[in-house]
Regions:
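Basic, glycine-/proline-tolerant helical and adjacent loop/strand elements
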Residues: 1-50
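Extended aliphatic helical segments
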Residues: 14-17, 32, 43, 47, ...
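Surface-exposed beta-strand edges and their flanking turn/coil or helix-capping segments
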Residues: 16-23, 55-58, 133
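Long amphipathic alpha-helical segments
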Residues: 33-101
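C-terminal, charged low-complexity interaction regions
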Residues: 74-147
Length: 147
């Protein structure tokens, strides 16, 4: 299986605010809270591709304050393995773009040392993205070329 990862640095709603105006209440590589915008948890969105490929998008879920706090409290604990998160995709994922932005998503931890994986959705398109195989050229051609 060939694998490739693409990570979004920030959730789209945070990235849309000019850097000098962003007020991050707290955050890091996996958890971010932005004053007046919301709380976000980094998750992995796996996409199966033709030819035995897989791509994982390091994307963000917009979550409630309660969900963010619960996640933060369990992040480095043994109970992290039992963590399930509900939220909404906070990035436009290529090639589907804004059609996935705001899609309801459920994520679950697979391994103690990994980010939670998106495992389900009530959104029809996101459910298809998770369950179907996609032409690898259509997806990988949307990735930025490494310089």
């Amino acid at each position: 299986m060939h694998e490739r990862d693409l990570r979004f640095k920030l959730p789209d709603p945070v990235f849309a605010v000019p850097e000098q105006q962003r007020e991050l209440s707290w955050g890091g590589d996996a958890l971010v809270a932005a004053r007046g915008i919301g709380q976000f948890i980094r998750v992995l969105l796996p996409v199966r591709l033709s030819g035995g490929y897989e791509v994982r998008y390091g994307t963000w879920l917009s979550v409630s304050e309660k969900e963010a706090r619960r996640t933060w409290e369990t992040w480095d604990q043994a109970s992290y393995l039992d963590l399930e998160i509900s939220g909404f995709l906070a990035n436009a994922i290529p090639p589907w773009g804004k059609a996935l932005l705001g899609a309801q998503a459920r994520a679950r931890v697979r391994k103690q040392d990994e980010l939670p994986y998106v495992v389900g959705s009530s959104n029809e398109l996101l459910a298809r993205v998770l369950s179907e195989e996609w032409p690898h050229e259509d997806v990988l051609d949307t990735f930025p070329n490494p310089a």
